[in-house]
Design a protein with these regions (language model features):
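Glycine-rich Rossmann-fold phosphate-binding loop(s) that bind the pyrophosphate
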Residues: 1-3, 25, 191
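Helical element adjacent to the flavin cofactor pocket in flavoenzyme catalytic cores
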Residues: 128-186, 193-197
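Short beta-strand to alpha-helix junction loop
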Residues: 51-54, 80-90, 128-147, 157, ...
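Dinucleotide-binding Rossmann-like beta1-alpha1 core, especially the glycine-rich loop
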Residues: 38-112, 116, 233-236, 241-247, ...
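Flavin-dependent oxidoreductases
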Residues: 8, 165-293, 304-315, 319-333
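Glycine-rich FAD pyrophosphate-binding loop
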Residues: 14-34
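C-terminal lid/capping helical subdomain adjacent to the catalytic/cofactor pocket in oxidative enzymes
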Residues: 5-8, 12, 16, 107, ...
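Conserved Rossmann-like nucleotide-cofactor binding loop
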Residues: 5, 28, 194
Length: 407
C-alpha cells in the first residue's frame, strides 16, 4: 500500500539495505494518509500507543530535516480544552503512562488556556497541553516520502493493484499484481481500509471497518492560534499557509456494509459506548461491497482494481464546525470554507493498530488498523514494521499490537 505506513516501512527497510517494491492501486497518499487532520500527537493516546507515539514524533522530525521539511512538519503543541475536573480525569491513564515514559505535559487553568487560544477559556477553563506535539501537511507528506525512498532505490509502482499473495509450503512466495507476479520472501500488508479484505483471501480474520470523517479548510487567520486545538465539537490545526484545517472532532459516519454484520460482535462494545457520535448510513456503499467477493469468485477484476481510490463526499456536520470555531475562540469571526472533503479511516474494535507477524502465513507482516491515528504514528509504525520484517530488536515492545488479540 502507498499510504504513509507502507512508504515509511519501505524507507526503513531500504535504509537497512533491503530491496523493496511498494505497490499502490491508486496514487500514493490518496486515501486516509492525505485526507486527515494532520496532527502528529502524543497527547491523549491509548496507553498502548504512547511509547510508539514518542518515537514516531522523533522520527518525523529527523526525516523532515533530511527532506528540507517537504512534509510541512513543525512542533506546535496540542491543547485539549476541558470543561471540568471530571473531563480531565478521563485522561488520567494517559497522564500516568506519559509520566512513566518521560513525556512532558501540562494541566492548565483558565489563564494558561487563554495564553494559547484566547477565548477558549470561557467554555473550557481547563487545558491539557503537550508542548512537544507537532503537525504536518497530509497532502504533502506521502508524495514527499515516496520521492525520497525512490532516491534510496525503492520502486514505487502506482496504479497497480495487488490481486493476491501466493504461498509455497504455507509461506509467502510471491505477490500477484495486475501487471504480473513478483517473487518475494516477505510481504507487508499496509493497505489501510482494504487490509481486512486482502487478508481474508488468505484465511486471516481481521475485524476492521471504515468510518467516514468530513473536514474543511478555512480562509487564512494570520493572528490565530498556533497550537492544534481539540474541544467537544471542534478539532483545529494550523496549516503552513495560515489556513485552519477543521473537523467536528468526534462525529463520524459508519456505512452499513456486509462487514458490519461479519464483525458485529467485535464492535458491539464500541457501538454501545460511542453510539451518540456515530451516524449509521445505509446506501450505495452496501451495494458496492456486496459485489466484492462475487466479482473475485468469478475471476474478474478484483475490488482493488475496480475502486482505485475511496473518495466519499463530505456530509453536513462539517458545516457546524465553523460557527463553533467563531464562538469559542477570539479573532475567528466570519469563518469561510475554502475546501471541503471527506475520507474513510480504518478502525479496529479497540482503536489500536495491528503491527504484527501473521503467524498463519510465514513471511507476512501486517501493519494496519491505525484507527484515525495513523498519520502521527506513521514513522514509528513504519519503523516498528520494518524491525519485525528484519527480525531486529523492535523500537518499542510490539506485544500489545499483535494480530493474535483478535483470534
Amino acid at each position: 500500500g502507498g499510504g504513509l505506513i507502507g512508504l515509511t516501512t519501505a524507507m526503513f527497510l531500504a535504509e537497512a539495505g533491503q530491496t523493496c517494491v511498494v505497490f499502490e492501486k491508486g496514487r500514493v497518499g490518496a486515501e486516509q494518509s492525505g485526507r486527515n487532520a494532520g496532527w502528529v500527537r502524543q497527547q491523549g493516546r491509548d496507553v498502548r500507543e504512547v511509547p510508539l507515539s514518542i518515537e514516531s514524533l522523533r522520527l518525523w522530525g529527523e526525516t523532515s530535516r533530511k527532506l528540507s521539511n517537504a512534509t510541512g512538519f513543525a512542533v506546535c503543541g496540542s491543547l485539549y480544552g476541558l470543561r471540568n475536573d471530571a473531563e480531565l480525569q478521563a485522561y488520567a491513564p494517559w497522564m500516568a503512562r506519559a509520566r512513566e515514559c518521560g513525556l512532558a505535559f501540562e494541566v492548565l487553568g483558565a489563564d494558561g488556556v487563554r495564553r494559547i487560544a484566547p477565548g477558549l477559556e470561557r467554555e473550557f477553563p481547563i487545558g491539557l497541553f503537550t508542548p512537544s506535539d507537532g503537525r504536518a501537511e497530509p497532502e504533502l507528506a506521502a508524495p514527499a516520502i515516496a520521492e525520497h525512498i525512490q532516491s534510496l532505490g525503492v520502486r514505487v509502482v502506482q496504479g497497480c493493484a495487488v490481486k493476491g499473495i501466493e504461498r509455497s509450503a504455507g509461506a509467502v512466495s510471491a505477490v500477484v499484481t495486475e501487471r504480473g507476479t513478483v517473487a518475494c520472501s516477505r510481504v507487508v500488508v499496509a493497505a489501510g481500509a482494504w487490509s481486512s479484505l486482502l487478508l481474508r483471501s488468505l484465511g486471516i480474520r481481521l475485524p476492521q471497518l471504515k468510518a467516514m470523517v468530513s473536514m474543511a479548510k478555512t480562509q487564512p487567520f494570520p493572528a490565530g492560534h498556533q497550537s492544534s486545538i481539540w474541544v467537544e465539537g471542534l478539532s483545529s490545526r494550523r496549516c503552513a499557509d495560515g489556513r485552519l484545517s477543521i473537523e467536528h472532532g468526534g462525529r463520524y459516519v459508519a456505512d452499513i456494509v456486509p462487514d458490519s454484520f461479519r464483525y458485529l460482535r467485535d464492535f458491539l462494545p464500541v457501538i454501545r459506548e460511542q453510539g451518540k457520535d456515530m451516524k449509521l448510513r445505509l446506501g450505495r456503499r452496501m451495494l458496492t461491497e456486496l459485489g466484492y467477493e462475487r466479482w473475485w469468485r468469478r475471476g474478474g477484476a478484483t475490488p482493488f482494481e475496480r475502486e482505485r481510490v475511496l473518495d466519499p463526499s463530505p456530509v453536513a456536520i462539517v458545516d457546524a464546525v465553523g460557527p463553533t470555531l467563531s464562538r469559542v475562540m477570539e479573532g475567528h469571526d466570519q469563518v469561510q470554507y475554502t475546501d471541503r472533503w471527506a475520507g474513510y479511516v480504518d478502525v479496529l474494535p479497540d482503536a489500536v493498530p495491528v503491527i504484527s507477524h501473521a503467524a498463519a502465513v510465514p513471511g507476512l507482516t501486517v501493519s494496519t488498523g491505525y484507527s484515525g491515528h495513523g498519520f502521527g504514528l506513521s514513522f514509528g509504525g513504519g519503523r516498528l514494521t520494518a524491525d519485525l520484517v528484519l527480525g531486529r530488536a523492535p523500537i518499542v515492545d510490539p506485544s500489545d499490537l499483535s494480530l493474535s488479540r483478535f483470534s
